[in-house]
């Protein structure tokens, strides 16, 4: 074996990386150090549980050029979203491919939108937020979704709702 490749190294623990690196003289880490860390129930001393790419980046938002390559183009996010993500997480180095600007959802302005929801003493679930999310999804479904391939109505299967707690996901 000449090379060990670790995909999603932004979620692969440093200890595991060191262990598998013994299998070959060369190691290639692929992934995003800004990605959410792996889920772990155990507690280990630092930096054992730290992700390999996080350890390698040593606090930088992006890897310094001498340590690796930064893929500076996203094909997933429109420019409005990529600019925010780039500023917050990628040292303003991330750009959206022009093809992403063609993606539109009829009647909804591209970008980030804040919806304030009043509630009190919620912890891992919020019925108020769940109702708001459901209302927004129902409103979006059926609208004209335009992509590089053409346009069609937005389908419920096109929508992904992410929440920080499984209890909230189940509620939604």
Region annotations inferred by a language model:
Residues 1-172:
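Conserved helicase motor core of SF1/SF2 NTP-dependent helicases
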């Amino acid at each position: 074996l000449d090379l060990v490749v670790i995909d999603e190294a932004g979620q692969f623990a440093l200890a595991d990386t060191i262990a598998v690196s013994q299998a070959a003289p060369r190691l290639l880490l692929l992934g995003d150090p800004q990605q959410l860390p792996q889920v772990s129930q155990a507690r280990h001393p630092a930096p054992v549980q730290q992700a390999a790419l996080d350890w390698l980046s040593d606090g930088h938002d992006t890897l310094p050029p001498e340590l690796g390559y930064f893929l500076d183009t996203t094909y997933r996010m429109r420019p409005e979203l990529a600019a925010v993500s780039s500023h917050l997480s990628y040292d303003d180095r991330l750009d959206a491919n022009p093809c992403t600007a063609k993606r539109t959802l009829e009647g909804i302005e591209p970008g980030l939108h804040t919806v304030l929801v009043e509630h009190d003493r919620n912890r891992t679930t919020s019925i108020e937020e769940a109702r708001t999310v459901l209302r927004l999804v129902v409103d979006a479904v059926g609208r004209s979704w335009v992509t590089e391939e053409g346009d069609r109505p937005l389908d419920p299967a096109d929508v992904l709702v992410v929440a920080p707690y499984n209890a909230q996901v189940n509620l939604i």
